[in-house]
């Protein structure tokens, strides 16, 4: 199927390469089904373009013969007994969906390419005809320019067939570190595209059964067209690694903003939580629930607006290892005694929370994770729906205004204890003079987000109608002026991310490196499976190579010339 399509494009290229500039009057096809014959020699021996040839359907007798051959050679067989069971599995459904999207994208892209190539050819022919008729340019010069155009078109055609590779990217600096790999600021060499290149260790992913999470992240990134979600530019793989080249969001994450500001003004907190709701709603509209939202998942772009990233846990379930670990922690703290949650002041709790994040330096980066933002029904392994993301947003709004999460304690165990009895420990913070730290409408929103599923807000429309958002115009939110705009030197400025050449910054990832090295030592080379089906992706926007045509010394930019 693919080779036939490529041959058709090659035939078109062959027809064009035989054109000469002795007769530029190319006959137009007489019908939409018209096809071009290969170029032939005219009576004077000169090459002329192929003439249109109308499509002629085969006779009915031929069609019957063709059908009979199909029925004889491909007689139906009985389906396996487990066919329907296998067909209903989520893994099978994903492959089917990816396959459908792949073929739709493949053929739409191919047809766009053929149409745009014909348009470019007509433009060049008109230009060369003008050169000959108006400026009396010689046929030799015209043919040289035509040959140059053909060379550019062949380059574009070759690029269409090339899959992205690691060597196509220039690594600039490291900007992130995870349990399964690294994130680098990189530049694509042929197009100068700046991206965040996530490189994941295939051995670890297969060893820990995390490939489904990566595939889900890839699927979400390729599906989204929303400005609220980080977009995928390229996805590819080699025997050792999986690669996700995403748009680079240079303003750092919301966690960094909270660390630098400690607390936000009420108006600023309202702006950011509004944008977070928009981003989460964009994910929900795609049919996914994030399940593990935290400040690190929200990035700030160059204009100061929010983008949601890191969709690995949106596959449908959190990993069994993580859930079991958290359930064990919940059980362990069941009978422990801790100081009363409400006895501490806002300032005391704020200090405890920040000290714990410093002393337990891997608190937020651990492979198991912390329970600060995760809804209780997720931790307990119970059934849940998309509103668990609203619980997480309620925790983040709480933290933005007072500087600590609603269930934070002096230790991880105490945090689990507070979460286990959240109805008792969730209290409206008060200042030293006993004034409420939150306005009534702020507290009303928080208690509608951090609530039992039956009492939790059920939709984004309900959220928008709450009095807390009375000043927010959600329709124009993304074009409004944000409280903070990153100060960037250029598009490769990574100053808002950790410096991986700095020992202090690297200390945050000590536990991640230790666990990664331990797992790597356990993985055998034979553990690497075959290629992941439906992983490769190439976006169709932006600069992806040029097939520009020189018109009077200037490059002609064609909207379709970026396809390859």
Swiss-Prot record:
<feature type="modified residue" description="Phosphoserine">
    <location>
        <position position="17"/>
    </location>
</feature>
<feature type="modified residue" description="Phosphoserine">
    <location>
        <position position="366"/>
    </location>
</feature>
<keyword id="KW-0597">Phosphoprotein</keyword>
<feature type="domain" description="Protein kinase">
    <location>
        <begin position="169"/>
        <end position="469"/>
    </location>
</feature>
<dbReference type="InterPro" id="IPR000961">
    <property type="entry name" value="AGC-kinase_C"/>
</dbReference>
<feature type="domain" description="AGC-kinase C-terminal">
    <location>
        <begin position="470"/>
        <end position="547"/>
    </location>
</feature>
<dbReference type="InterPro" id="IPR000719">
    <property type="entry name" value="Prot_kinase_dom"/>
</dbReference>
<feature type="modified residue" description="Phosphothreonine">
    <location>
        <position position="536"/>
    </location>
</feature>
<keyword id="KW-0067">ATP-binding</keyword>
<dbReference type="GO" id="GO:0005737">
    <property type="term" value="C:cytoplasm"/>
</dbReference>
<dbReference type="Pfam" id="PF00069">
    <property type="entry name" value="Pkinase"/>
</dbReference>
<dbReference type="GO" id="GO:0010458">
    <property type="term" value="P:exit from mitosis"/>
</dbReference>
<dbReference type="GO" id="GO:0000281">
    <property type="term" value="P:mitotic cytokinesis"/>
</dbReference>
<dbReference type="GO" id="GO:0005524">
    <property type="term" value="F:ATP binding"/>
</dbReference>
<dbReference type="Pfam" id="PF00433">
    <property type="entry name" value="Pkinase_C"/>
</dbReference>
<feature type="active site" description="Proton acceptor">
    <location>
        <position position="292"/>
    </location>
</feature>
<feature type="region of interest" description="Disordered">
    <location>
        <begin position="24"/>
        <end position="62"/>
    </location>
</feature>
<dbReference type="GO" id="GO:0106310">
    <property type="term" value="F:protein serine kinase activity"/>
</dbReference>
<comment type="function">
    <text>Is probably a Ser/Thr-protein kinase that may function in initiation of DNA synthesis and also in late nuclear division.</text>
</comment>
<feature type="binding site">
    <location>
        <begin position="175"/>
        <end position="183"/>
    </location>
    <ligand>
        <name>ATP</name>
    </ligand>
</feature>
<dbReference type="GO" id="GO:0035556">
    <property type="term" value="P:intracellular signal transduction"/>
</dbReference>
<dbReference type="GO" id="GO:0005816">
    <property type="term" value="C:spindle pole body"/>
</dbReference>
<dbReference type="InterPro" id="IPR011009">
    <property type="entry name" value="Kinase-like_dom_sf"/>
</dbReference>
<dbReference type="GO" id="GO:0000917">
    <property type="term" value="P:division septum assembly"/>
</dbReference>
<dbReference type="GO" id="GO:0004674">
    <property type="term" value="F:protein serine/threonine kinase activity"/>
</dbReference>
<dbReference type="InterPro" id="IPR017441">
    <property type="entry name" value="Protein_kinase_ATP_BS"/>
</dbReference>
<dbReference type="GO" id="GO:0061013">
    <property type="term" value="P:regulation of mRNA catabolic process"/>
</dbReference>
<keyword id="KW-0808">Transferase</keyword>
<keyword id="KW-0547">Nucleotide-binding</keyword>
<dbReference type="InterPro" id="IPR017892">
    <property type="entry name" value="Pkinase_C"/>
</dbReference>
<dbReference type="InterPro" id="IPR008271">
    <property type="entry name" value="Ser/Thr_kinase_AS"/>
</dbReference>
<keyword id="KW-0418">Kinase</keyword>
<dbReference type="GO" id="GO:0005935">
    <property type="term" value="C:cellular bud neck"/>
</dbReference>
<comment type="similarity">
    <text>Belongs to the protein kinase superfamily. Ser/Thr protein kinase family.</text>
</comment>
<dbReference type="GO" id="GO:1902554">
    <property type="term" value="C:serine/threonine protein kinase complex"/>
</dbReference>
<keyword id="KW-0723">Serine/threonine-protein kinase</keyword>
<dbReference type="InterPro" id="IPR050236">
    <property type="entry name" value="Ser_Thr_kinase_AGC"/>
</dbReference>
<feature type="binding site">
    <location>
        <position position="198"/>
    </location>
    <ligand>
        <name>ATP</name>
    </ligand>
</feature>
<protein>
    <recommendedName>
        <fullName>Serine/threonine-protein kinase DBF20</fullName>
        <ecNumber>2.7.11.1</ecNumber>
    </recommendedName>
</protein>
<dbReference type="GO" id="GO:0032465">
    <property type="term" value="P:regulation of cytokinesis"/>
</dbReference>
